[in-house]
């Protein structure tokens, strides 16, 4: 989400690194606190006979930038430098640089109250249907590989999934005696959840088939999208984003492990515990979701209610899962492993509200230089600076 940074130094701002951050929207009190937080704040007062800078007018500038960031989601960056305080008390922006997004996301615009509440209710219902799916179709299901990996279908079956499981692969008649289907339209019912495990270039066509056959709840396990940082991966992600939006699809992923729900024996990796408990996890990283879940169970004997790995966050993001788990009766503690956040202000507001009912524990990656590189290569997220998180 939009953030506002304030600091002194003109062309030396980056070298001095004397800055304060806030997530928009700001109020006047927050803006004035920003001004007072920088180490060189004494320079803004009666320093060596200079007239003090008018803090109210300076706060006006910060408030204006805050509003601009919220009202114009197509703006990626505004750099006002230098901002000069004149002897008469005026604040003058001498130069400014505005960088626009080529394709602004519709999620950046503020939704109306009723529309937002309706969307949240629909997403909660969809996520509950996914977590408690009575039927799952695995597109790209395969027989166990020579190295022993069972694939998405095998992991679900071996874990003892309690619903109806449909392998979809036009090249197979069956998988270990279970009938395989050539496509989604040949299934005997509309599955509550479709797991897509095919090469990235094929995912868009599978999503089109999902939309055409009424399958709305999707988990894309496949990788090879924007997390690669390559032009083709970015293009493929934009394509599936368009297809998902046009089809009204609710997508977890791509590049993720999806749901782990011990109660329902739902699992997309191998060797997990069936022990249930009060902890739920929201994780961008599938590997960390797996390791964290196994660690808590194996070392501390703490069971899980739900674990959700969501990768590149195509249509559903951390705030959607947080809103869902806040109302989930099986979840008593919410843990989050975050690499990037689309709407930081919404996340903060949610956490403050939910903490009154159940604790929310956040593990934030990408705060160091090496961590930021790892995050970028993994999910393609913008990790965000350490000061913003503080």
List each language-model region with its residue ranges.
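Catalytic-core regions of core metabolic enzymes
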Residues: 1-390
């Amino acid at each position: 989400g939009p953030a506002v940074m304030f600091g002194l130094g003109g062309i030396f701002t980056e070298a001095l690194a004397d800055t304060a951050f806030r997530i928009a929207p700001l109020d006047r009190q927050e803006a004035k606190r920003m001004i007072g937080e920088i180490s060189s704040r004494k320079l803004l007062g009666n320093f060596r006979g200079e007239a003090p800078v008018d803090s109210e007018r300076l706060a006006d500038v910060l408030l204006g930038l805050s509003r601009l960031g919220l009202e114009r989601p197509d703006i990626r960056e505004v750099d006002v430098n230098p901002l000069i305080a004149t002897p008469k008390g005026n604040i003058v922006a001498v130069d400014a640089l505005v960088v626009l997004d080529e394709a602004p996301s519709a999620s950046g615009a503020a939704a109306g109250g009723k529309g937002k509440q309706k969307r949240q209710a629909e997403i909660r219902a969809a996520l509950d249907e996914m977590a408690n799916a009575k039927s799952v179709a695995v597109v790209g299901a395969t027989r166990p590989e020579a190295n022993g990996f069972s694939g998405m279908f095998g992991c679900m079956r071996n874990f003892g999934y309690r619903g109806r499981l449909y392998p979809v692969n036009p090249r197979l008649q069956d998988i270990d005696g279970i009938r395989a289907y050539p496509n989604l339209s040949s299934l005997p019912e509309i599955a509550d959840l479709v797991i897509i495990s095919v090469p990235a270039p094929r995912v868009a066509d599978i999503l089109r088939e999902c939309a055409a056959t009424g399958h709305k709840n999707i988990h894309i396990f496949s990788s090879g999208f924007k997390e690669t940082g390559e032009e083709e991966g970015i293009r493929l992600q934009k394509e599936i984003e368009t297809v998902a939006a046009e089809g009204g699809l609710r997508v977890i992923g791509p590049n993720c492990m999806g749901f782990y729900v011990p109660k329902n024996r739902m699992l997309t990796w191998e060797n997990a515990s069936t022990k249930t408990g009060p902890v739920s996890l929201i994780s961008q990283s599938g590997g960390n979701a797996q390791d964290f879940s196994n660690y808590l169970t194996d070392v501390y004997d703490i069971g899980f209610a739900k674990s959700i790995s969501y990768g590149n966050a195509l249509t559903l993001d951390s705030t959607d899962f947080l809103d869902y788990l806040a109302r989930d009766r099986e979840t008593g503690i919410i843990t989050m492993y975050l690499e990037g956040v689309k709407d930081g202000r919404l996340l903060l507001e949610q956490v403050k509200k939910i903490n009154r009912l159940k604790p929310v524990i956040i593990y934030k990656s990408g705060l160091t230089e090496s961590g930021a590189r790892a995050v970028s290569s993994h999910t393609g997220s913008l990790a965000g600076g350490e000061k913003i998180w503080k």
